[in-house]
Curated annotation (Swiss-Prot):
This protein's pathway: Siderophore biosynthesis; enterobactin biosynthesis
Signal peptide location: none
Effect of M68V: 47-fold increase in catalytic efficiency toward 1,4-dihydroxy-2-naphthoyl-CoA and 10-fold increase in catalytic efficiency toward lauroyl-CoA. Does not affect catalytic efficiency toward benzoyl-CoA
Stated name of the protein: Proofreading thioesterase EntH
UniProt entry keywords in alphabetical sequence: Cytoplasm, Hydrolase
Amino acid sequence: MIWKRHLTLDELNATSDNTMVAHLGIVYTRLGDDVLEAEMPVDTRTHQPFGLLHGGASAALAETLGSMAGFMMTRDGQCVVGTELNATHHRPVSEGKVRGVCQPLHLGRQNQSWEIVVFDEQGRRCCTCRLGTAVLG
């Protein structure tokens, strides 16, 4: 297991109370040895005007996952901040849920890179994101 902080899924989800994460319906669903996953509904909260999943909602899911994964790689007195987010959208989603899967690409002392892949309910890749974070403290 790579994580330096040991939080349960309930504890992870509690961090979202009264935030945009909760408003979008993002819920952490899996914490593995080197992976963090979350689901987000595709509904009126996350649609763009034409009834499809908004690219910004996919980006919000990615940044949520990468930032929390980055935080779990820090020690007491440290935090992470996002420095760059890149998203490539592959296919539209109009309903149901999407699942984000976050894994590390680089874990340095001062910066991290995370890959977050967003899948639809059929397991098809809908969006590929990369988040860079800086470790502070």
